[in-house]
A protein has these predicted regions:
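Acidic/His- and Gly-rich active-site-bordering loop/insert found
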Residues: 214-301
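Alpha-helical metal-binding/catalytic segments enriched in His/Glu/Asp
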Residues: 290-293, 299-339, 427-433, 439-465, ...
Length: 625
C-alpha cells in the first residue's frame, strides 16, 4: 500500500563487506538518509537500541523486527529481511491481519487528515497519491470500499514499485482492480508480500544503500522493451519474434550496451545471436559461457530470457570499471531465438552453438509466407556461416544461466533466489478420443460413448498422479470438441498432453501410467483413441560441481538455500548436451507469473542475482589460479 525509498538487496554486499566476493557491487546512499546505520552496529547494539534502530519498518508493529533480532548476528541485510519474513510467517493469521489492518488505506482518510506515519506520507507522496484529480480520488475511494467490503482488510500495495521509483496512479488503480477479484487466501498472502517489499525499501533507507547494479539491469530491460513487433506495439504489448525489425533493433541495442560495458569483442553472428567476449588475463585460457534469449512470446514479459543476458553484462561492466581480468574469459550470448514463435524452430540460437541448426528450418514459412532463409537474407545474415557458429566445448569451463523463475514457488516462500537442480524432461502428445455423437436428450447416461467425459476422467487422473511425485507436472493445455453442439453428446474430443519430470526415468514412469490409464478408460467406456508424440526432450540435471557453486554463492549472501527443478525449458538444456551447466532462478512478483505483461521482479532481487553471479566468478578465479 505505501512504501519508502529506493530499495536494495544490494545492502547485502555492504553488510557482509564482500568477504566472500572480491568484485564489489557498488551502491550509493539515498539522499533521504543522513546517518545510515551499519549491520555491525545493529549486531553489536544492546537489544533495546537495536530495536530502536529498526523502528518504523512495519507500520505500528515493532514486534516483528524485535523478534527478528533473536537471529543476530546477521550476515547481511538479506539475512535480516528473511528473518523478519519468518517472524511474520509463523505469527499466525490473527497477528498477520492485525499488521495489515494497521496500515492506512491508499489516498484514504489518514492521508486526508494528515495522520499518516512519516514513512507512509513519503511513500504515498512519491506515488502521486497526494495529488489525485477528483476523479482519481473518487475511483480510489470506491476501490478501497469495495476491497474492504470483500476481504475485511485494507488493500496493501508497495507503491514505490519494483525499482523503488514509484508506480504511477494508473498502475496503482490497475493493480487495485485486478486484485479485487482474487481469492481471500491469496490476497492475504499478497498483502503480506507487499508489506515485506515496503519494509525492504524502508530498511535500505535506514542502511543507506541502493541496488545500483540491480537498477542497471532493470533499466536495460525497460529500455529493450521499447522495441516490439507491429500491431503489438500499438497496443502497448511486448512481442519480439525472430528477425523482425524490433528483433534486429534489440540485437543492435544489446550490442551497443555490450561495447559500453567493456567487452573486448562484440558481434552479431550468422543466426542473430549477439556475442560479447571479455578476454582472460592471459591468452589461451578457457571461457565461461553464459547468456539467455532476447526474443519473446506474443504479449509477453520483459524479464524472460533477458535477465540472463543483462546480469552477466553488469558483472563484466564492473570488472571493466575496476580494470580487472580473470584467469578465464567470459562469453555472454544473447540468443536470438528460443521461443519458437515466428518459425517452428525452438532453441534456434543455442542450438546453433552446439551444431544443432537444422537446415530444413531455412525453408519454413511464417504466417506471411516468408521463409526463414529470406528473413535471414533480409537481416544481412549469411546462412553459409551458420556451421561456423558451433563451439568447441574443450574451450569452455561450462555454461551457467540466470532466469526469472516463471513460477510461484519462490514468491510464495519469500526467498529471492533458487538454485536449479534439473531442467525437467518432457514429452508432448496430440491425442483424440473417438466415441459416438448422439442426441443429448434421448441417449441414457449408461449408454453414452462420450469422448469428452473420457478426457475429463483422464485429466483428473493426471492431476492426482503427477501430484504423487511432488515435482512432476501433467497438463492438458488444449481441449476441443470438433463441431460440438449444445444438444449433442460429444463423439470426438481432441486434446494435448504435456508431461514433465526432473529425470527421464521419472518422466517415463509418468508417461507409462498416463497411457495405461488412457487405455483403461477407453476400454471401459467403449471408445477408442489415437496419440501422436510431437516432442520429447531429455531432462538436464545440473552438473553437481556447478550447482554447488551456485549454492555457495547464495549461502554467502545470507539468503536461505532453496533448491527446485525447472519445469520450463531453457537454453541451458541445449548447452547441457555438450558441456556442464547449472541455473539460478530469481523470484518473480505477481505470483511468479510469466509469458505475461505482469511478469516482474525487483531491483533488489536482481542485485542479489548479480552478487551471486559475482561470487561464482570469484570462486572460479580461486579454482583456476
Amino acid at each position: 500500500m505505501q512504501e519508502a525509498a529506493p530499495a536494495a538487496e544490494s545492502s547485502r554486499p555492504e553488510a557482509h563487506s564482500c568477504k566472500h566476493t572480491n568484485i564489489r557491487p557498488q551502491g550509493r546512499p539515498p539522499t533521504e538518509t543522513a546517518m545510515p546505520i551499519t549491520l555491525e552496529q545493529l549486531n553489536s547494539a544492546r537489544r533495546e537500541d537495536a530495536a530502536q534502530m529498526l523502528d518504523g519498518l512495519y507500520e505500528h508493529s515493532p514486534w516483528i523486527a524485535e523478534q527478528a533480532l533473536n537471529e543476530r548476528p546477521f550476515k547481511s541485510l538479506a539475512h535480516l529481511k528473511h528473518a523478519m519474513c519468518e517472524v511474520l510467517a509463523h505469527a499466525g493469521r490473527d497477528a498477520q491481519l492485525g499488521l495489515i489492518r494497521a496500515h492506512p488505506e491508499l489516498a484514504g482518510k489518514a492521508m486526508v487528515s494528515k495522520t499518516l506515519t512519516a514513512e507512509s506520507t513519503n511513500e504515498q507522496t512519491k506515488a502521486g497519491l497526494t495529488d489525485c484529480t477528483p476523479e482519481e480520488f473518487a475511483k480510489i475511494q470506491q476501490l478501497n470500499a469495495d476491497y474492504n467490503a470483500k476481504f475485511g482488510w485494507p488493500f496493501i500495495l508497495a507503491v514505490r514499485g519494483p525499482r523503488g521509483v514509484g508506480l504511477n496512479k494508473a498502475q496503482i488503480i490497475e493493480a487495485f482492480e485486478r486484485r479485487l477479484h482474487g481469492h481471500p487466501d491469496f490476497e492475504l498472502a499478497e498483502c503480506l508480500r507487499n508489506i515485506h517489499r515496503i519494509v525492504e525499501i524502508r530498511l535500505n533507507d535506514k542502511f543507506g544503500v541502493e541496488p545500483t547494479l540491480g537498477h542497471q539491469v532493470w533499466d536495460w530491460q525497460e529500455k529493450l522493451a521499447q522495441h516490439s513487433d507491429p500491431d503489438f506495439a500499438e497496443k502497448g504489448q511486448l512481442t519480439v519474434t525472430y528477425l523482425t525489425d524490433a528483433h534486429r533493433a534489440c540485437a543492435q541495442r544489446i550490442s551497443h550496451w555490450m561495447k559500453d560495458c567493456g567487452f573486448d569483442e562484440v558481434e552479431i553472428d550468422a543466426v542473430g545471436n549477439v556475442v560479447g567476449r571479455y578476454h582472460p588475463a592471459a591468452a589461451g585460457q578457457k571461457y565461461l559461457l553464459t547468456g539467455s534469449h532476447y526474443d519473446t512470446v506474443r504479449n509477453g514479459g520483459k524479464y524472460d530470457g533477458r535477465l540472463g543476458i543483462f546480469v552477466p553484462m553488469a558483472c563484466v561492466q564492473q570488472l571493466h570499471q575496476q580494470g580487472k581480468r580473470l584467469p578465464f574469459g567470459i562469453e555472454v550470448v544473447a540468443f536470438a531465438e528460443e521461443e519458437g514463435q515466428r518459425y517452428k524452430a525452438t532453441f534456434l540460437g543455442s542450438g546453433a552453438l552446439i551444431g544443432d541448426f537444422k537446415p530444413e528450418w531455412l525453408d519454413q514459412k511464417d504466417a506471411d509466407g516468408i521463409t526463414m532463409r529470406a528473413a535471414m537474407q533480409h537481416a544481412g545474415l549469411c546462412t553459409d556461416d551458420i556451421p561456423k557458429i558451433q563451439r568447441d566445448p574443450a574451450h569452455y569451463l561450462g555454461f551457467i544461466e540466470v532466469h526469472i523463475e516463471q513460477g510461484p514457488v519462490l514468491n510464495e516462500v519469500n526467498i529471492p533466489l533458487g538454485v536449479v537442480t534439473s531442467i525437467n524432461g518432457s514429452v508432448r502428445y496430440l491425442c483424440e478420443i473417438i466415441g459416438t455423437a448422439s442426441h443429448a436428450g434421448t441417449t441414457p447416461m449408461d449408454r453414452r460413448r462420450d469422448a469428452a467425459c473420457a478426457v475429463a476422467e483422464l485429466a483428473l487422473y493426471m492431476e492426482q498422479r503427477a501430484a504423487k511425485d511432488g515435482d512432476s507436472v501433467a497438463t492438458i493445455g488444449q481441449l476441443q470438441v470438433p463441431n460440438g453442439s449444445i444438444n449433442v453428446v460429444p463423439g470426438r474430443c481432441s486434446f494435448s498432453l504435456d508431461l514433465r519430470a526432473p529425470t527421464d526415468a521419472q518422466r517415463d514412469a509418468l508417461v507409462a501410467d498416463v497411457m495405461a490409464q488412457l487405455h483403461s478408460i477407453c476400454e471401459r467406456r467403449g471408445v477408442r483413441y489415437t496419440c501422436e508424440e510431437t516432442m520429447r526432450a531429455a531432462a538436464a540435471p545440473s552438473a553437481p560441481e556447478w550447482q554447488a557453486r551456485w549454492e555457495r554463492a547464495v549461502s554467502a549472501l545470507g539468503v536461505p538455500l532453496f533448491k527446485l527443478p525447472s519445469g520450463a525449458g531453457h537454453d541451458a538444456m541445449k548447452l547441457h548436451e555438450v558441456m556442464p551447466q547449472a541455473m539460478l532462478f530469481v523470484r518473480g512478483e505477481n505470483a511468479g507469473i510469466s509469458h505475461n505483461p505482469l511478469e516482474s521482479t525487483t531491483s533488489d532481487d536482481m542485485q542479489l542475482c548479480v552478487d551471486a553471479f559475482t561470487h561464482v566468478l570469484n570462486q572460479l578465479e580461486q579454482e583456476t589460479r
